[in-house]
Amino acid sequence: MAYNNSVRKRKKDIQDANGFHRDQTIDKKSRATNKLEESLPTFKVFIVLFFIRLLNSLTIKTFFQADEYYQCLEPAYNFVFGSGYITWEWEEGIRSSIHPLIYALGYKMVSYVHFDDKPIILIPKVIGALIASIGEVYLYKFSKKFTKNEKLARLTLILSLLSPFNWYIITRSFSNSFEMVLTTIAFTYWPWDNVISYKDISMSCIIAFISCIVRPTNGIIWLYLGINFMIKNYKLEKQSGKLMKLILILSIELILILLVNTGLDYIFYGKTTFPLYNFVEFNVIRNLSIFYGVAPWHFYLFQGVPIILMTYLPWLLHSAIVLKKYKSLLGQVAILMIGGFSLIDHKEIRFIYPLQPIFMLMVAYSIHETKHKFQRLYKFLVPVIIILNLIIAIFFTQVHERGVIDIVQYLRNNPDIESFGFLTPCHSTPWQSHINNPNLVNKSWFLTCEPPLHLTTTSLKEIKSYRDESDQFYDNPAQFLSEHFQSFADSRNTGASNWPSRLIIFEPLENFMDDFLRGSNYFECERFFNSYFHWDDRRKGDIIVYCQI
């Protein structure tokens, strides 16, 4: 009997022990689950994101598009130092000053200190990293608010960080990148549940109004969301009074923002001008935007969206089609914006970049819904996708089109250069915002591409018949050079020359220039790798520098 009691006691002890360990395991899982459901601390997230995006920004060695410099850094540099290159857009006043003024503030800070060239190059990168990291903090907040799911919010943030297109463009000084960040912030405060909250809606619309001033086409998003919100609340009883109050508040906000913006534009331009009206007149009334290229209606479907998404594209398609997220309000916004931009003749990939927060969230939805069903496949796919994204990001930020940045560093760091000229398509490189040498302002030039501003209305036929300076050169390089420069014989006889000490070309012109310069005092002195391929045949291959003896 004593033996049986002893056995029972031992069994009970074992059961108690097993139960304790089991409860411990449950407690651990419960704590882990609770921890995963807790929101991440905003400041810590921002600090981590800022250092990631600062690394991103500081390591970019390549060129993407000219607007990164000529629609932001050059006018900002000119505002502070007086020698940035001002394109026709700023002469005509079709751009808001808000975006370049942010960078001008950075330039102004470093102007108070005696410095070398490095801070001038670095300060825009720091500002770009700051803007990007704020945007991704709000991407996390927006995803959490919209889905009410912490795991989805974190996944959306991770996808954004691992996106090769984001790594390529998000920290650059494009107004589209700034627009995307503003859109994400405004999304965060938007009442997706259609509940009237004066505080949140006011904050959302303040950011949305600024975004539309920076990029007027962003209004497509906010007109649709606003109309949708009004209709749904109008149908509810006893909401008309609240709606009228909301409309009054937002009207006052808009008027105040427009007044402040007009003041900023006056300070920046030195005169009273209305960029929003000028933008509409240039792009809509006169339709001069087609001067910069016309793309087919399906450009965004088959080029824009796939390039922005890259390796994430299958998950976006799954989310939109299989999970039917195209029916959601965010899906409707994306469809409307892509459809609206598809109707505009002039198209560029970055024009739909403000849809990136929607794309990232839809991709996260797809992964969240399929990861358990295809668990074994994901164990293989995840590292493959990460590696592919890294390869793409490294190639486009370190290799593709790095020569046009290297040549500017060469010009900046070589004190023996007295003058230089670019026989290349217009705006192929940054200018004074990177060269930072006021002594060379009047001794340097590139071929320009001013649009036909003299035309009051424009047809595609008229645009094709118009030849800007770059076109004139590439139509007949020999004739252009003969008309604009002294012959080498005349230069030797008179002892004077309007030829620069450095001539820079892209590789496709190499054979012509070698023949044209034969017998002159020029020789090839430097060559920089630029690209293996390029959408513009004139920009393929290396950058070549001819030095004058």
Swiss-Prot record:
It comes from the Eukaryota. Glycans are attached at residues 287, 442. Pathway: Glycolipid biosynthesis; glycosylphosphatidylinositol-anchor biosynthesis. One of its GO terms (cellular component) is endoplasmic reticulum membrane. It is found in: Endoplasmic reticulum membrane. GO terms for biological process: GPI anchor biosynthetic process. Keywords: Endoplasmic reticulum, Glycoprotein, Glycosyltransferase, GPI-anchor biosynthesis, Membrane, Transferase, Transmembrane, Transmembrane helix. The keyword Transferase applies. Residues 1-39, 141-154, 227-246, 311-328, 368-379 are cytoplasmic. GO terms for molecular function: alpha-1,2-mannosyltransferase activity. Its main location: endoplasmic reticulum. The chain crosses the membrane at residues 40-60, 120-140, 155-175, 206-226, 247-267, 290-310, 329-349, 351-367, 380-400. Residues 61-119, 176-205, 268-289, 350, 401-549 are lumenal. Its EC number is 2.4.1.-. It is a multi-pass membrane protein. PANTHER family: GLYCOSYLTRANSFERASE (PTHR22760), GPI MANNOSYLTRANSFERASE 3 (PTHR22760:SF4). Belongs to the glycosyltransferase 22 family. PIGB subfamily. Mannosyltransferase involved in glycosylphosphatidylinositol-anchor biosynthesis. Transfers the third mannose to Man2-GlcN-acyl-PI during GPI precursor assembly. This is GPI mannosyltransferase 3. It comes from Debaryomyces hansenii (strain ATCC 36239 / CBS 767 / BCRC 21394 / JCM 1990 / NBRC 0083 / IGC 2968).
